[in-house]
Amino acid sequence: MALDTDRPRLYYSDMNDAIAVALVHAAHRVEARVETALAGVGLSNAKFEALSVLVSQDRPISLSELAEKLTCVRSNVTQLVDRLEADGLVKRIDDPADRRAVRAEVTALGRKRHAAGAPVVHAVLQDVAKKLSAIDSQVLKRALDAVQ
């Protein structure tokens, strides 16, 4: 994919900026594809990611811990857990160590919905990956690792 150098200079001042902008745009396009695919199983990407964390932990976790693992702020996680709870995918339980805190626990329906979403996400990601040659993939992986 060629860089879109027809964009106004407002977006970038040199090739490095153009590459960074192209990377962000590519990420948005992949995320949109994942979002569309997950809609078919009744999930958003945010819900799927939260369920992924909860399923992988296999124990109730605090909302602060969930926020940390999702790399977002606690208030966003509170709203996300509200939506997950309304859908019956997560339940809040009291934290035995801190009466002021609650933990999020994935429900059986949440596990089932996550299990339905995982192959959908995998298929989208595989489709994206197969568009890259093995050499392109190695170069891109090194470049993305450097950004972190």
Predicted segments with their positions:
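Short aromatic/hydrophobic contact patches that present stacked aromatics
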Residues: A20, K69, R103
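Active-site phosphate/pyrophosphate-handling residues
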Residues: A18, E49, Q138
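A short beta-strand-loop micro-motif that forms or neighbors metal/cofactor-
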Residues: L144-Q148
